[in-house]
Curated annotation (Swiss-Prot):
Substrate binds at R129, M302. SUPFAM superfamilies: Alanine racemase C-terminal domain-like, PLP-binding barrel. The keyword DNA-binding does not apply. Keywords: Isomerase, Pyridoxal phosphate. The gene is alr1. It is an enzyme of class 5 (isomerase). It holds the Pfam family Ala_racemase_N. NCBIfam families: alr (TIGR00492). This is Alanine racemase. The lineage of its organism: Bacteria, Pseudomonadati, Pseudomonadota, Gammaproteobacteria, Vibrionales. Its cofactor is pyridoxal 5'-phosphate.
Amino acid sequence: MKAATAYINLEALQHNLQRVKQQAPESKIMAVVKANGYGHGLRHIARHALGADAFGVARIEEALQLRASGVVKPILLLEGFYSPGDLPVLVTNNIQTVVHCEEQLQALEQAQLETPVMVWLKVDSGMHRLGVRPEQYQDFVARLHQCENVAKPLRYMSHFGCADELDKSTTVEQTELFLSLTQGCQGERSLAASAGLLAWPQSQLEWVRPGIIMYGVSPFVEKSAVQLGYQPVMTLKSHLIAVREVKAGESVGYGGTWTSQRDTKIGVIAIGYGDGYPRTAPNGTPVVVNGRRVPIAGRVSMDMLTVDLGPDACDRVGDEAMLWGNELPVEEVAAHIGTIGYELVTKLTSRVEMSYYGAGV
């Protein structure tokens, strides 16, 4: 019997990419596969993301893993390179880079490279995390055009800070600023990530960058991915390793944080924070056992968590438990825990077995 296993539905992945294409038909797709494919497995996701025109990663190591696995499509470093010594690696492996600061620009100007690097100039349109400020934009464009180490034409991108908050004007302001700055430019542009392409169609430029939605997880609080026409790619399961009777008034788990109000049965499931399931999950967080939702009862420990199966439960050792997936949206679990689906799927540890199915696997 397996312990915790993440089942990855590659047909759902392909469905989701097709859905992105339906919603942004005029845009090319840069599938974002950073953080080990959002916890789904970098190489498997890239291999089966058939609708992707390019891939976006955060770290050069991720780009090199993709190249080593046989990926030949364009790859972009979304944070750019970290040091001048990275530039020859980009050239050798045909990796594109974001440029967002003076230090990166100077490194390009001073480098001696065999061939130019494809550069995306990142503009700070209002998030104020990475990117050149609007007043720096023209100077950066001019210097990049003059730099022999930069392939032409330049490309341009920015990132939204509040695209998941539909009642804010911030996204409209960022879009208008970016479009104004890049008006008349020769190169391709990218503005929309998941929330942008779903909710702000005016941000669907030459490229869109689906991340979390590609994995069937919604970027929005008020709508699940299923409601948006997407399918969950990951289903996280484990098994009951014990079913115990607990009397009214007895407490369960470390710290005695849950006390039974009745005689009941407690199920012990083989998954815990050592597998990446959050210790912060409170009492009442739902788990699915034999097709019904049951609440977490007691503190999540390193290797186990406990649920209240109810006094009349017929569940047995070895029965399956679903932590999130087809029958329990990860967005719902995240809401109970006070986090976001992104964090849950990316924090699974190496103890969790990955099992891929669908799409000819």
